[in-house]
Each structure stands twice: as structure tokens, then as C-alpha cells.
Amino acid sequence: MATGTDQAVGFGLVAVSLIIFTYYTTWVILLPFIDSQHVIHKYFLPRAYAVLLPLAAGLLLLLFVGLFITYVMLKSQKITKKAQ
């Protein structure tokens, strides 16, 4: 059973994810159909970042996954060498 802290952290992560999803969806899907002089445009970054930010996040994710796999493989080789 999850503790109160676990539930609070989980709720916070879900809330942040929903906010990011709503913001990004509005930015990418709805904003191109709204007049460029409308007030809502000042709350969003330029459209070029709509591609660059997810691309950078994906590259960072791949980097950290690759580093983790490399670390685990090197650690596994050291343990195997010690056992021999």
C-alpha cells in the first residue's frame, strides 16, 4: 500500500504531466489556427521551439539510457572478471 507521501508525489507528477500535455497540445495544435495578433500568443514560445524542445528532451533521454546501459555493462564485466 502506498504511503501518503507516495500518493502526494504521484498526484504531483500526474498534475505536472497534465499541465505540460495541455500546454503543448494547445501550443502545437490550436495556436496555428488563432490569429497571430491575439493575446494568447504572448503566453507561448515561438513555434520553432515546438520541435526543438521535444527533440532535445529525446536526445537527453537517449543519452542517459545509453550511459546507464554502458554503466551496467561495465559493472557486469568487472564482477565477471573478479569471479574468474
From Swiss-Prot:
Involved pathway(s): Protein modification; protein glycosylation
Major localisation: endoplasmic reticulum
GO molecular-function terms, A-Z: dolichyl-phosphate beta-D-mannosyltransferase activity; enzyme regulator activity
Presence of keyword Endoplasmic reticulum: yes
Pfam families, A to Z: DPM2
GO biological process, one term: dolichol phosphate mannose biosynthetic process
PANTHER family registered for this protein in UniProt: DOLICHOL PHOSPHATE-MANNOSE BIOSYNTHESIS REGULATORY PROTEIN
Protein's recorded name: Dolichol phosphate-mannose biosynthesis regulatory protein
Naturally occurring in which organism (per UniProt): Mus musculus
Gene: Dpm2
